């Protein structure tokens, strides 16, 4: 079985952990930004399914709203 010859220094562990956290934060920020865009109704490039409780069928809807201002 392969065994590491020396311990990894604290600084190297800290650097690797920081890089991992930065990647996770970037992915979370991007996902949150996309979610806000979709929920605000300003998105024009997303197609998603809308489930109506009154009807059993689902419809594919794209958001194409003009600016109401």
UniProtKB/Swiss-Prot annotation:
Keywords: Chloroplast, Plastid, Ribonucleoprotein, Ribosomal protein
GO BP, sorted A to Z: translation
Taxonomy, superkingdom: Eukaryota
Family the UniProt entry places it in: Belongs to the bacterial ribosomal protein bL32 family.
GO cellular component: chloroplast; large ribosomal subunit
Gene: rpl32
Major site of localization recorded for this protein: plastid
Localisation: Plastid, Chloroplast
Listed name of the protein: Large ribosomal subunit protein bL32c
Matches recorded under HAMAP family: Ribosomal_bL32 (MF_00340)
InterPro entries reported in the protein's UniProt record: Ribosomal_bL32, Ribosomal_bL32_plant/cyanobact, Ribosomal_zn-bd
Molecular function in Gene Ontology: structural constituent of ribosome
């Amino acid at each position: 079985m392969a065994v590491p010859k020396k311990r990894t220094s604290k600084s190297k562990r800290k650097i690797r952990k920081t890089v991992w956290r930065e990647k996770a934060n970037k992915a979370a920020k991007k996902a949150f930004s996309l979610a806000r865009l979709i929920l605000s109704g300003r998105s024009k490039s997303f197609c998603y399914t809308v489930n109506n409780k009154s009807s059993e069928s689902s419809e594919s809807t794209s958001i194409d709203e003009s600016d109401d201002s």
